[in-house]
Amino acid sequence: MCGIVGANSTRNVTNILIEGLKKLEYRGYDSAGLAIIDDKNNIDICKEVGKVIELEKSVHNLANFKGDIGIAHTRWATHGKPSKNNSHPHASESFCIVHNGVIENFAELKKVLINDGYKFKSDTDTEVIAHLLQKEWRDNFSIVDNIKYIMAMLKGAYAVAIISQKFSDKIVAVRSGSPLVIGVGIDENFISSDALSLLPVTNKFSYLDEGDIAIISKDNVEVFDNNGAAKNLEVEEYNYSSSSASKDGYKHYMLKEIYEQPEAVSNTILASLADGEISLDSFDKRAKELFEKTKHICIVACGTSYNAGMTAKYWIEKYAKVPCSVEIASEIRYRDNVVVDGSLFVSISQSGETADTLESLRKSKKQNYVGSMCICNVPNSSLVRESDIAFMTKAGVEIGVASTKAFTTQLVALAIFTLVIAKLKNSLTDQQIAKYTEELKNIRALVMGALKLDTEIDQISEYFSDKEHTIFLGRGLYYPIAIEGALKLKEISYIHAEAYPSGELKHGPLALVDKNMPIVAVVPNDELLDKTLSNLQEVHARGGKLILFVDKAVKERVNFDNSIVLELDAGHDFSAPVVFTIPLQLLSYHVAIIKGTDVDQPRNLAKSVTVE
């Protein structure tokens, strides 16, 4: 969602801040701004509604807008509409701040501040923090003691970066529920909500823990815990290059990331193998003990990651013979849920910073789970650091808001997890494990084959040019894949799309079917084929337009006139959900192009949802 960048250097930081904001554009935003302390100790602010490029133009048009310390922000509106006044940074007399998150008690605090004579220029919760700093700051207190005292007045989840004339050579940052990472350089140091934004200036990072306070000087970074005790700065090198965030000649990040999936899924599989076999070491040394205790699996996630979890439920129960439930994080977080004896808490998140998923994990630690595992794409993210064990996917940097390669690598990770559990529980023989492992190894080739449908899918996307509604159908293991296909289409083309289990057509959705309703379905080679074809016949009989992605092994069984049928080699249970996902992603992409939408940054959506 919102993005923070801060820099404290011996050089002018204006361009560093702007370039950092550009790297954060993928997170979603509606306005941007930055603030610097100039050589006369003045705080100068520039803000614009719209894209970062507009902010860059405004800054370059200002004479002498430069300084060696500053903070910047991309805003995704939560309190107050998108406007210059509501854009960050926000300032009081001596303090200037940028903020991610939500201050839940801002209305009460604002009322008190107004009664005390403080004037507000915006409708945001953020400006409350700036005035609260001004009101409550005590010059005879240390920076840490002041921050502890003032931040204790705030309720909610937030990350804050502060510059001030009271400490004009420092940036102060606070993490309470929203992620922050320190970037370490030579005679310069940085703060950001995402390491990706700082890759052009450093590859050395330290992630703040919950409750941490950081004081960032040019030549030093001090970190304190929520009790005010000093901590060691643990710095790690980040192995992504800044080119990871480029389009590499593709028109959109999403298309690039769709085409990166053969490598992404292959890398995820290869990382789990030792001597050609799936290894427990790809999880953690503690995994064997934890998995042996597991009698039930509770998967918790949001959005696309939830759909991956739904797919895994079918695998886990069919092959590992372990009962599995799948929960939406924003629901289980607030529900008085009953924990099954021997239940393992499994969270899934691409970023590892999804607010509801993270808070659900924290809640689980107070409950009777045997332990926690996460599946994540970002090393050192909060979810990874706070889970007992982690399986890291190898998707690489994903910029497009609509997840593609993160989803397919999550599926692969969950397939590997299923086979590991099945082996430990003796639910499958060694021969069966070896067979399914070979199937996973073959996914790369199958995904590459599915990508060859791109031209045909581009051609059929024209059919959707005047459509406003679509139904997706899938059965059994492929129902979650239909849900994911519908989610992709609605996310980036703004077509209203819903997914249903094929067997549920008679229970309501069939009423929507007519000659103007596109019906997208996947037809795998599985034990439910006859049932699936029967359901599709019901749609066909009522004039619905069928767009079918069919496993070539059953192509001859599919005979519906006036329908669009594309065939592919999908493989079997462990590969087919991944492979069928590819044409659904391509369909969504090409329909969005036809509709003229912003594919990489669809309206109202953010890549990393770090607030509720």
From Swiss-Prot:
GO terms for biological process: carbohydrate metabolic process; fructose 6-phosphate metabolic process; protein N-linked glycosylation; UDP-N-acetylglucosamine metabolic process. The active site is at residues 2, 607. Residues 287-427, 460-602 form the SIS domain. Residues 2-219 form the Glutamine amidotransferase type-2 domain. It catalyses: D-fructose 6-phosphate + L-glutamine = D-glucosamine 6-phosphate + L-glutamate. It comes from the Bacteria. Pfam families: GATase_6, SIS. GO terms for cellular component: cytosol. InterPro entries: GATase_2_dom (IPR017932), GFAT (IPR005855), GFAT_N (IPR047084), GlmS/AgaS_SIS (IPR035466), GlmS/FrlB_SIS (IPR035490), Ntn_hydrolases_N (IPR029055), SIS_dom (IPR001347), SIS_dom_sf (IPR046348). Keywords: Aminotransferase, Cytoplasm, Glutamine amidotransferase, Repeat, Transferase. Its main location: cytoplasm. It is found in: Cytoplasm. GO terms for molecular function: carbohydrate derivative binding; glutamine-fructose-6-phosphate transaminase (isomerizing) activity. Its EC number is 2.6.1.16. It is an enzyme of class 2 (transferase). Homodimer. Catalyzes the first step in hexosamine metabolism, converting fructose-6P into glucosamine-6P using glutamine as a nitrogen source. This is Glutamine--fructose-6-phosphate aminotransferase [isomerizing]. The gene is glmS.
